[in-house]
């Protein structure tokens, strides 16, 4: 349950009433469920409206009996088809999460089972390390972090953690010359750290502590791999269900990855990032999708900021 329901003392404007009044129904439902779970009447009304969401209906209608979704293109190579099917599963389960779904409906259960089935016997999911980390984080959001099969995915990553505390996929391209020594990929490690910090047992492990130290030491660094090498990658606060959007989040994702780790709350770069986030609040009370270039604000980003601030109170 939320610790904080009034943000007027720590922000210029308290955005919570704005979210409850103006956000799209799925976001409003999630906000109320997080901050006011005791308001059963309003939650019930929003639940009815949420279930009539056109995109939600479309996703469930197009879902196959095995829990998967049909690909937009035909792939003749099996490995490519499996990878793209896995990616589609991540995208749709992410979108459904943002639409307010949980693991309770049978259709979601089938989709989650299908996602887990993409794992190999050793725990590896298709594609790269950041896809592995994101899949584990997503499964944790649906309450499956302790599932024995999901645990194999975490163990697979633990075995591949580098001495510097981070991770880098063997196939990942470098965006600059690293002849002086290859360090782990910053954004890959942030995504994986978020998966580990979402795990009630592993968040206090030495592996997570090393990963948290790696990313905190490199706050605002430019990444040296092909995963978001642009200097302003830290300004992209939004996340969504698109191929790249799942891995965005910038400074907000950095903070979300570290917030469950109480031992990081006094870290100077974590505190610096939190202070910077607070400064990004717009005059209308919302937070931007991308800092410095969004004047309207984003309801989803604002909800994530409030959850973050609540978590570290």
Role assignments for model-derived ranges:
Residues 1-313:
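Preference for long, amphipathic alpha-helical scaffolds in soluble/luminal domains
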């Amino acid at each position: 349950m939320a610790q904080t329901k009034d943000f007027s003392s720590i922000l210029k404007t308290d955005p919570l009433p704005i979210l409850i009044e103006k956000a799209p129904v799925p976001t409003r439902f999630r906000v109320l469920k997080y901050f006011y779970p005791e308001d059963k009447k309003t939650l019930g009304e929003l639940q009815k409206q949420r279930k009539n969401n056109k995109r939600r209906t479309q996703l469930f209608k197009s879902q196959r009996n095995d829990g998967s979704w049909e690909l937009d293109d035909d792939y003749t190579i099996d490995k490519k088809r499996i990878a793209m099917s896995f990616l589609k599963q991540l995208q749709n389960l992410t979108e459904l999460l943002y639409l307010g779904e949980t693991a309770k409906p049978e259709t979601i259960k089938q989709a989650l089972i299908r996602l887990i089935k993409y794992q190999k016997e050793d725990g590896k999911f298709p594609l790269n390390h950041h896809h592995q980390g994101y899949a584990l984080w997503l499964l944790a959001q649906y309450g499956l972090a302790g599932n024995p099969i999901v645990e194999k995915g975490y163990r697979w990553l633990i075995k591949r953690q580098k001495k510097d505390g981070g991770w880098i996929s063997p196939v990942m391209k470098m965006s600059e010359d690293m002849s002086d020594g290859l360090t782990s990929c910053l954004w890959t490690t942030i995504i994986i750290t978020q998966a580990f910090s979402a795990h009630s047992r592993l968040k206090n492990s030495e592996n997570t502590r090393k990963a948290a130290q790696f990313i905190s030491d490199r706050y605002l660094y430019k990444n040296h791999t092909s995963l978001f090498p642009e200097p302003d990658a830290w300004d992209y606060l939004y996340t969504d269900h698109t191929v790249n959007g799942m891995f965005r989040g910038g400074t907000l994702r950095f903070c979300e990855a570290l917030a469950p780790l109480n031992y990081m709350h006094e870290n100077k770069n974590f505190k610096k990032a939190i202070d910077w986030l607070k400064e990004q609040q717009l005059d209308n009370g919302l937070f931007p999708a991308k800092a410095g270039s969004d004047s309207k604000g984003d309801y989803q980003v604002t909800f994530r900021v409030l959850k973050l601030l609540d978590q570290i109170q």
